[in-house]
A protein has these predicted regions:
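C-terminal lobe and adjacent flexible extensions of AdoMet/dcAdoMet transferase-like proteins
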Residues: 200-256
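Catalytic cores of RNA-modifying enzymes
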Residues: 1-202, 231, 242, 251-252
């Protein structure tokens, strides 16, 4: 079989203990359909098939997609040779589960796709770059737009660290498992999302600036007005965007 393709960000993981751990984190039952993104050689696919009713494996690499079905004859595996960003998630049953070892270059797009989909998964388990996993699960004091964007839709927690040397070829950095349990109701109402993110982006556009400056320039509001607004919400104008909780941003957005 051909080796990993650098252009597709492919890194093979064959450590059985880690693969079992990733599959276990998803809480898969015998009734579940699992969407696997980028199954590669099928090492994780094997663990998913042991647990799930069905696995839908979306693989961009035509060579790998062609070979995968032959590795698992007589199973409930469906292989789709397609870019996950163009895959219609509405084709999946409700409450499906996503498990994936995701190429680093496409991580943010995949998270956005899944968390904002009309047919959202119940649980998302991703093996991604360690730094990105930790940013997703950040708390006030270390927040980012990525963390806010994920956490309004899901409860995020971290799983195990997977050292780079366990992959073939080894990536330049370690990876980490991150688990997103989708919320029944997003923290921000759909009708308020546009306003909410306009304000959050204004705060983070110059993340090292204090809020009085970043919100003033980003929202085109005078600094005294920003200070009064923040004070009314119990927020210091000397704080930075990374210091605020999602609830803080929700409180601020209600005045717009």
């Amino acid at each position: 079989m051909a080796g990993p393709k650098k252009s597709l960000g492919q890194h093979w993981l064959k450590d059985r203990d880690v693969l079992m751990s990733i599959a276990d984190e998803a809480g898969i039952t015998a009734k579940d359909t699992v969407l696997e993104i980028g199954p590669g050689l099928g090492t994780l696919t094997s663990e998913l098939l042991r647990r799930a009713k069905k696995v839908v494996a979306v693989e961009l690499d035509q060579d790998l997609a062609r070979k995968l079905p032959g590795q698992f004859p007589g199973t409930s595996l469906e292989v789709v040779n397609q870019d996950i960003l163009t895959f219609d998630l509405r084709d999946l049953p409700e409450n499906y589960v996503v498990v994936a070892n995701v190429p680093y270059y496409i991580t943010s797009k995949i998270i956005q796709l899944l968390t904002t989909a009309t047919n959202k998964p119940r649980t998302i388990v991703l093996l991604i770059q360690k730094e990105v996993a930790e940013r997703l699960a950040a708390e006030p004091g270390d927040m980012s737009i990525l963390a806010v964007s994920a956490q309004i839709y899901a409860k995020v927690r971290l799983g195990e660290v997977v050292p780079a040397e366990l992959f073939t070829p080894p990536p330049k950095v370690d990876s980490r498992v991150v688990i997103l349990e989708m919320r029944d109701t997003p923290l921000v109402e759909p009708t308020r999302e546009k306003t909410f993110f306009r304000i959050v982006k204004a705060g983070f556009v110059a993340k090292r600036k204090k809020l009085r400056s970043s919100l003033s320039s980003g929202l085109h509001i005078a600094k005294p007005e920003v200070e009064a607004l923040l004070q009314s919400k119990g927020i210091s104008a000397d704080d930075r965007a990374e210091d605020l909780s999602i609830q803080n941003w929700i409180d601020i957005s209600r005045d717009f």
